[in-house]
Amino acid sequence: MKITEVRLGLISVPLRVPFKTALRSVSSVEDVIVEIHTDTGAVGYGEAPPTGVITGDTTGAIIGAIRDHIAKTIVGRDVDEFEDLMIALNGCIQKNTSAKAAVDMALWDLYGQLYKIPVYKLMGGAKKSIVTDITISVNDPEEMVRDALNAIDRGYDCLKVKVG
């Protein structure tokens, strides 16, 4: 299974309610979508959120890192040489963690397809349950209390409260 092409796309998903922190207010979530195509027709998918304010990784930086460095490093290589692919991915450009993570996801997807094993099994198997949280946006204290109580009513028992 040889990598033949890396395609990039953008997606924007509107949020039901704007998410606010001290740094920004977000009303939609943007993602760079990565598709890695192979000579067998298999396609691996990954994604990277451009969160320049937090990570420094902007949409342009992610696309540029993948298009100008990472894709050139992995196209033509065999997915079965997984460890070498990962070493090449991590060594072809410094930093750019979001771009690398998106390609990493797509490579894991392809590796699982190659061996007909779901990625969750490749990574140790399924869990019966996982602990997750919900972040309460910065707002008036009364609205934050309402949001927290609403989250608890929806089954969350772990809250991350933004206070500034």
Place the predicted regions along the sequence by residue:
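Short, Gly/Pro- and small/polar-rich lid/capping loops
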Residues: 1-32
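Metal- or metallocofactor-binding catalytic centers and their adjacent structured scaffolds
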Residues: 5-7, 37-114
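Residues that line or immediately flank small-molecule/substrate-binding pockets and catalytic motifs
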Residues: 10, 50, 163
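Glycine-rich anion/phosphate-binding loops
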Residues: 26, 96-104, 140-145
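Broad gene-expression machinery/nucleic-acid interaction feature
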Residues: 31-33, 102, 131, 158
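Structured core elements
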Residues: 33-35, 45, 160-162
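Metal-dependent enolase-superfamily TIM-barrel catalytic cores that perform enediolate-based chemistry
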Residues: 121-164
